[in-house]
Regions:
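Short beta-strand segments
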Residues: 1-7
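Conserved donor-binding/catalytic loop of nucleotide-activated donor transferases
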Residues: 67-69, 87-94, 98-101, 109, ...
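Aromatic "clamp/platform" in nucleotide-sugar-dependent glycosyltransferases that forms part
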Residues: 77
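Short glycine/serine-rich donor-binding loops of glycosyltransferases
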Residues: 82-85, 103
């Protein structure tokens, strides 16, 4: 079963329209769909359903779904960072995502997931088939461990806090660029020139020439 999960606000026209388009597309491909807005109804969905739409879910239910997943598909293009792949990898789930934006930084190709062109359907299909039918349990477990380790090492609160602290420390410890002797002399002459011009102007004004 393919489970589609996303933040959904019925007041936003684009959300409603996009859901309708996805449902219609799945139906046109001969797949049975269902939409569930509550946890009880989602749990009672029959196994004959091919695509399940969950417009909005709680964090606890999301984590429960991730724990039972084989692969997370992340389709946004040029996403600035994307927290969803991080959440999946933290749960030990490999991620297949668009090779643009944030996933380029968060996903390690072939180790914690895969990056493919969003418009290349065969490439995405190939990865899905690989995960579901070709990779052995040992290989999937290795990816799961690597995904968890990457999140802990690079994107955990501790890791990001240490990185931020290091950057701030480097900024505070950097010394101001020192002037060399020539620069100091030129600066002094410039200041003297300005001072002399001001003095002459004052004298001329005092004696009535200006």
């Amino acid at each position: 079963m393919v489970t589609w999960i996303g933040g959904y606000d019925p007041r936003i026209t684009e959300n409603v329209q996009y859901h309708k388009e996805l449902d219609a597309l799945a139906t046109s491909l001969g797949m049975q769909t269902a939409t569930s807005k509550t946890v009880p109804s989602a749990l009672s969905i029959p196994s004959s359903i091919d695509v399940l739409f969950l417009p909005s879910v709680s964090s606890a239910f999301r984590d429960s779904l991730l724990a039972k997943s084989s692969l997370l598909l992340y389709t946004p293009v040029n996403e600035h960072f994307g927290i969803v792949p991080i959440e999946a990898m933290r749960a030990g789930i490999p991620v297949l995502a668009s090779n643009t934006g944030g996933p380029l930084e968060t996903i390690v190709e072939g180790k914690t997931g895969w990056l493919r062109d969003s418009g290349d359907v065969p490439a995405w299909t190939s990865v899905i088939e690989k995960v579901l039918y070709q990779l052995g349990a040992d290989e999937l477990q290795k990816m799961s461990v690597a995904a968890k380790e990457r999140v802990e090492a690079e994107f955990s609160l501790r890791a990001m806090g240490e990185r931020l602290e290091g950057e701030i420390g480097e900024m505070l410890s950097s010394e101001r660029r020192q002037f060399n002797g020539g620069q100091q002399a030129l600066l002094l002459l410039g200041m003297l020139g300005v001072g002399f011009a001001v003095l002459v102007g004052s004298v001329l004004a005092w004696v009535g020439f200006v």
